[in-house]
């Protein structure tokens, strides 16, 4: 006899939208994994600076309804079996009005999600909050008013040392929200401990794996003849230099080049510091050694990863970058700074870790990987991801959490 599917609503602070199809992609993947075993509705609100009405174009998307409740534009779609409600609204200049509009937008989304696309009642069994604190307050209020339990998944690295988690009201609200949650999940044990160090207490902290599309990311056979093959380094990030430290990576690559070692580095992504990093590469005279692809998604990203020899990340702080899992699924070893929860995934059989903010150490690790990347077993690297991070595995894990 089949188990009855629960109706779970994701209240997401980060989620792909019309202006940024990569924003919070890992939350969308969790929703898709959860939808294998339960009925999932996603509610997401996004401030805008324009009046245009356009829809996010994705594969496997069916528009159910698009309409306006001033000043909100609501776009409801069915995406990979996930009922997705995006609420867009123009950004007010007043901060208090902006906060009130944010809460109203999410309350509208919650109300709409209680009915399916045909208008049939569909109450929530559980609220799944992704990223604190504001959405956690909404979930807490819903628990008080409707007795609907909620759980939390935190992805944000703001609790880690050196990051900004402050303010009396914010901390107090976060403590209340976390204490009253049925369960708290994080994508690394490191983040869970950091949250608890801030006094965010809950009896049930659980590590929730990220999701990798194992059908998309694949191992590619390469011509690695030592006499002709130029090692290809891959870097993927959102090009925000404060955290991702792309400038430090470029400086390390310059050290490698000055030692007379041949390589090519492909930098994938876009973001606020994209143009600045291109200028930095020009200043370092690395234009013949590095290339900037801009944003790559889906199969294009998977194919570019598979064409490389290894992945390099140079972050100053991180949580658990999904791109590491995608690289391993593609059979690529990893060179990374030892920050956040990365050491929970990368050991000496999968790559090399170095201390952050040390360009000489990163350069030495890159040189070592250029010399030894063929010693890593691509099948072993991929297998390390398959059993834990596939859609079905994570979907079953979420289902077990929802039924606790």
Give the positions of each predicted feature.
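Short hydrophobic beta-strand element within catalytic cores of glycosyltransferases
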Residues: 333-336
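Aromatic "clamp/platform" in nucleotide-sugar-dependent glycosyltransferases that forms part
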Residues: 316
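Carbohydrate-associated surface elements
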Residues: 190, 211
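Conserved donor-binding/catalytic core segment of Leloir-type glycosyltransferases
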Residues: 9, 226-244, 250-254
